[in-house]
Curated annotation (Swiss-Prot):
One example GO MF annotation: xenobiotic transmembrane transporter activity
Taxonomy of the source species: Bacteria, Pseudomonadati, Pseudomonadota, Gammaproteobacteria, Enterobacterales
Keywords carried by this UniProt record: Cell inner membrane, Cell membrane, Membrane, Transmembrane, Transmembrane helix, Transport
Cited InterPro entries: AcrB_DN_DC_subdom (IPR027463), Acrflvin-R (IPR001036), Multidrug-R_MdtC (IPR023931)
Name used for this protein in its record: Multidrug resistance protein MdtC
Topological relation to the membrane, as annotated: Multi-pass membrane protein
HAMAP family, per the entry: MdtC
Primary location group: membrane
Keyword NADP attributed: no
GO cellular component entries: plasma membrane
Sequence intervals crossing the membrane: 12-32, 333-353, 360-380, 387-407, 435-455, 469-489, 528-548, 853-873, 875-895, 897-917, 953-973, 984-1004
Gene it is expressed from: mdtC
Subcellular localization(s) per the UniProt record: Cell inner membrane
Subunit: Part of a tripartite efflux system composed of MdtA, MdtB and MdtC. MdtC forms a heteromultimer with MdtB.
Source organism superkingdom: Bacteria
Length: 1024
């Protein structure tokens, strides 16, 4: 009593407290970073190792396996996958979410050091690692194009100047340059000329390496002068290498230009990027964890004039993809929904109270509660994102509830003629415990969510904390500011508004009287009401089992990724043309704004495309509909497939795949895996629940298999290492020397001329010079024939692995897809030696699916415990929780009606409903218990009076929550696919629960009262 009186009697202090909350919230809002979703930092580390020219099987056995054995001993590794391809190995280590990434990095470095002695000596550099976050897509992609500069020169400008400057921008963590490689001097050997001159390829390599060295020459101290000694020991251009003497033939010098074409080119000629139909170099920019995406993009754009000024005018630097516009638009839509929700909620209050002064009270309480939440968000390290702003939108209906309950009860006393201050004190005292119970039990719903492990727990932690803080601030405001404003603003018997109140009151009174008559019938026919309640429980079970489920709503971020997979034996030149053809098809679609792509590197039969769609206001189709439309056109391209998927803000797992979802086959026997993978893939491709089924198993690449005749080699004085060196020198793009420049280092690359690398008959022209100086053709001691060879070797853990990727067809659900895959595996009869498991997002979905019911039950149990403590009763919490089945039915029916799958967003909606719908029961039960304790009346009369007395605040709070969620249901534009499931779930649950709980709660109250009387004759205990 004294607590409430303190704030009513000290309006200045109460006002200043409110202003302090508001000011801190405004400051917090200005400091909050912006992102599409809460930051989930996956502790993922990628280890890279290279050995140019080595085939995938060699990389897997000699590089990947030793590294995997060392890295697999690190504590906290959840998953280890590796891909070994031509000349490179990439190992992805995914750690437990609770693992510190910096500590994990130290352990990785220690493991790499321990494995160094087990690695081949021919590796040009030690394995490296870098930290990465697979769920964080690039925030911007830039392209460099020019009509006058070569690809290598563009790459040099990009990596030497632009990448360095962009990386220094606040918020940027990494800038990756792609689409070409650094400039290099390429020595393109002519095998015929070498044979005629009697010069081996290895002799050329040694001569070049010896001619280009960078060593200190020292200094000379004369009597008066200190002289530095500097020699011309380096050759830095192709022109300088051409006259280099590599051999003497009968006393005549053989120069490099006599046996090779020496040109200024690039390190890797099998690497190409394209943008807008012309060759391009790509700059892929990523942000730091937790950085404000919009602010970071704005800083980069502000640097554009300086970046363009740092490169020649004939080089065009353009932005090909910008992640920020859709984020801006999505957050603008959420903020608009928030403002509309506040306005609708206040309108509900005005319609019921018909008083400008009374409406002013929640009009102040709601914004203060929401604004104050921003301060707590900043202190917790949260961001402004779709989920946190959705939490505030939903909170609008919650925070006004407390104010409505207090305001409505005080207004009831004022209408009875009680003086304002007395009415305020009496009114807040009567409902103080009710408001406290409502708020605490609502926050209790989120306790299991806060303790939830894994991705869902991390993802929705901000949502739960933001909503809980808003409710907590609302509780404080409703018990301090609201009664103070009522005492000083409202008047008893406002005669000027009497008629208006009576006019609307007639409608409300008629509804209330009709409710009273129907409630009286329900209390007389309790068995029928119980049948309805039990039916809703059964209907909940059936609807939950039958409704399609997915992990997260399919987002339309305005960005798509394309992955090209061509015939495994395709040449790089043909692959470039495929990339160009696919880019033309995609770019011609009316919904597409820009297309950027690249191909090459360690996999010559694959390529990637970054696709930006036009803003939603300029296109009619969703991203998924655009993909569906393009599938038919892309299928006409022979010899290659392009798999398109919409870029999502949530991506799980570090493995690369051509589609959104993965199913991995594991086997200890590689032969068994290669036998069953095509069968499984073919079976999955026939499933209508899946689309774009493809595999990363590529074991049909064209290989020229050489067989050495070791006896002949021994007789000719040739060992295997010399023969292998010949092949590496000829076809391995071997980096044989380094050119040092002030800003960068460049390589001298040697191989045979392109006309020889593109023709397998070139093997006939290869030769080795033995110890006797004789030129021995390769064909003398080796035979070769075409064969199949893997383009990549994949491991998971230490097992051979093959990942089958798939997308969902338009309108498909992940639950139907995973169930279909499991049925197909069972029907195929796959042996136990080949194990199948979902990976990435599909794996997390299955784990989440198993825990959903437990999470809901934990939330219900937590609320029961809290209510039991508050009411000092085992029974009354059950009465209150009896409202939940009807809410569940309404939510699931609404999802079915809107053809929306049950996702994590819908699950959060169900959790919210657990907190929302019980408020009606709390208001009924509180007043019924008070009437029984103090009025000495029967349970039936008490609950009947309580239901009628609290009818107006029940309708008001329900409508407030409903109108708070309605903008989410009706939302459109960017991010609507995230907001709508939450709004649909809440609105559907509220509508059905409102219709049913007005009858089921009183009936359950009577049943439990009879049960209490049967086992205990003690009167109800008064709670002070």
């Amino acid at each position: 009593m004294k607590f409430f009186a303190l704030f009513i009697q000290r309006p200045v202090a109460t006002t200043l407290l409110t202003l302090a909350i508001t000011l801190s919230g405004i400051i917090g809002f200005s400091l909050l970073p912006v992102s599409p979703l809460p930051q989930v930092d996956y502790p993922v580390i990628m280890v890279s190792a290279s050995m140019p020219g080595a085939d995938p099987e060699t990389m897997a056995s000699s590089v990947a396996t030793p590294l995997e054995r060392a890295l697999g001993r690190i504590a906290g590794v959840n998953e280890m996958t590796s891909t070994s391809s031509l000349g490179s190995t990439r190992i992805i280590l995914q750690f437990d979410l609770n693992r510190d990434i910096n500590g994990a990095a130290r352990d990785v470095q220690a493991a790499l050091n321990a494995a160094q002695s087990l690695l081949p000596s021919g590796m040009p550099s030690r394995p490296t690692y870098r930290k990465m976050n697979p769920s964080d897509a690039p925030i911007m992609i830039m392209t460099l194009t020019s009509d006058t500069f070569s690809q290598g020169q563009l790459y040099d400008y990009a990596s030497t100047k632009l990448a360095q400057k962009i990386a220094q921008t606040e918020g940027v963590s990494d800038v990756t340059v792609g689409g070409s490689s650094l400039p290099a001097v390429r020595v393109e050997l002519n095998p015929s000329a070498l044979f005629n001159q009697g010069v081996s390829l290895d002799a050329v390599r040694q001569a070049i390496s010896a001619a280009n060295v960078r060593r200190p020459q020292g200094s000379v101290d004369a009597a008066e002068t200190h002289w530095q000694v500097q020699a011309n020991d380096e050759i830095k251009t192709a022109e300088g290498y051409r006259p280099l003497i590599v051999h003497y033939n009968n006393g005549s010098p053989v120069r490099l230009q006599d046996v090779a074409n020496v040109i200024d080119s690039v390190q890797d000629v099998r690497n190409a990027g394209m943008s807008a139909g012309q060759p391009a170099v790509l700059l892929v920019i990523s942000r730091e964890p937790g950085a404000n995406i919009i602010a970071t993009v704005d800083r980069i754009r502000a640097e554009l004039p300086a970046l363009r000024a740092s490169i020649p005018a004939s080089i065009q630097l353009n932005i090909a993809q910008d992640r920020s516009p859709t984020i801006r638009a999505s957050l603008d839509e959420v903020e608009r929904s928030l403002v509309i929700a506040v306005a609708l909620v206040i309108l509900v209050v005005f319609i019921f109270l018909r008083s400008g002064r009374a409406t002013l009270i929640p009009a102040v309480a709601v914004p203060v509660s929401l604004i104050g939440t921003f301060a707590a968000m900043y202190l917790c390290g949260f961001s402004l994102n779709n989920l946190s702003l959705m939490a505030l939108t939903i909170a609008t209906g919650f925070v006004v509830d407390d104010a409505i309950v207090v305001l409505e009860n005080i207004s009831r006393h004022l209408e009875a003629g009680v003086k304002p201050k007395v009415a305020a004190l009496r009114g807040v005292r009567e409902v103080g415990f009710t408001v406290l119970s409502m708020s605490i039990s609502l926050v209790a719903v989120f306790i299991p969510l806060l303790l939830m492990a894994g991705l869902p727990g991390r993802l929705f932690r901000e949502f739960a904390v933001t909503l809980s803080v808003a409710i907590g601030i609302s509780l404080v405001i409703s018990l301090t500011l609201t009664p103070m404003m009522c005492a000083w603003l409202l008047r008893s018997h406002p005669k000027g508004q009497q008629q208006r109140i009576r006019g609307f009151g007639k409608v409300l009174l008629a509804i209330q009287q009709g409710y009273g008559r129907s409630l009286n019938w329900a209390l007389s026919h309790t068995r029928w009401v119980m049948v309805v309640l039990l039916s809703t429980i059964a209907l909940n079970v059936w609807l939950y089992i039958s409704i399609p489920k997915t992990f997260f709503p399919e987002q339309d971020t305005g960005r798509m990724m394309g992955f090209i997979q061509a015939d495994q034996s395709i040449s790089f030149q043909s692959m470039q043309q495929k990339l160009k053809d696919f880019m033309q098809i995609v770019g011609a679609d009316p919904a597409v704004d820009s297309v950027t792509g690249f191909t090459g590197g360690s996999r010559t039969n694959s390529g990637s495309m970054f696709i930006s769609l036009k803003p939603l206001s300029e296109r009619q189709e969703t991203a998924q509909q655009v993909i569906t439309r393009l599938r038919g056109k892309l299928a006409k391209e022979p010899g290659a497939n392009l798999f398109l998927s919409s870029v999502q803000d949530i991506r799980v797992g570090g493995r690369h795949s051509n589609a959104a979802y993965q199913f991995t086959l594991l086997a200890d026997d590689l032969a068994a895996l290669r036998e069953w993978e095509p069968k499984v893939r073919a079976a999955l491709a026939k499933l209508p629940q899946l689309a774009d089924v493809n595999s990363d198993q590529q074991d049909k690449g064209a290989e020229m298999a050489l067989t050495y005749d070791r006896e002949t080699m021994a007789r000719l004085g040739i060992d295997v290492s010399e023969a292998n060196a010949l092949l590496n020198n000829a076809f391995g793009q071997r980096q044989i020397s380094t050119i040092y420049q002030p800003l960068n280092q460049y390589k001298v690359v040697m191989e045979v001329a392109p006309e020889y690398t593109q023709d397998v008959s070139s093997l006939d022209k290869m030769f080795v010079i033995n110890s006797n100086g004789q030129s021995i053709p390769l064909s003398y001691f080796a035979k070769w024939q075409p064969a199949n060879a893997p383009l990549a070797v994949n491991h998971q853990g230490l097992s051979a692995a093959s990942t089958i990727s798939f997308n969902l067809p338009d309108g498909g659900s992940l639950s139907e897809a995973t169930a279909a895959v499991e049925r197909a595996m069972t029907e195929l009869g796959v042996p136990s030696t080949v194990r199948g498991a979902f990976a990435g997002t599909a794996q997390v979905f299955q784990e989440t699916l198993k825990s959903q019911l437990w999470l809901i039950m934990a939330a219900i149990a937590t609320v029961y415990i809290v209510l039991g403590i508050l009411y000092e009763s085992y029974v009354h919490p059950l009465t209150i929780l009896s409202t939940l089945p009807s809410a569940g039915v309404g939510a699931l029916l609404a999802l079915e009606l809107f053809d929306a799958p049950f996702s994590l967003i819908a699950l959060i909606g169900i959790m919210l409903l657990i907190g929302i719908v019980k408020k009606n029961a709390i208001m009924m039960v509180d007043f019924a218990l008070d009437a029984q304790r103090n009025g000495n009346i029967s349970a039936r009369e008490a609950i009947f009076q309580a239901s009628l007395l609290r009818f107006r605040p029940i309708i008001m709070t329900t409508l407030a929550a409903l109108f708070g969620a309605l903008p989410l249901v009706l939302s459109s534009g960017d991010g609507a696919e995230l907001r709508q499931p939450l709004g649909i779930t809440i609105v559907g649950g509220l509508v059905v629960s409102q219709l049913l709980t007005l009858y089921t709660t009183p009936v359950i109250y009577l049943y439990f009262d009879r049960l209490r009387n049967r086992f205990s004759k003690q009167p109800l205990m008064k709670l002070e």
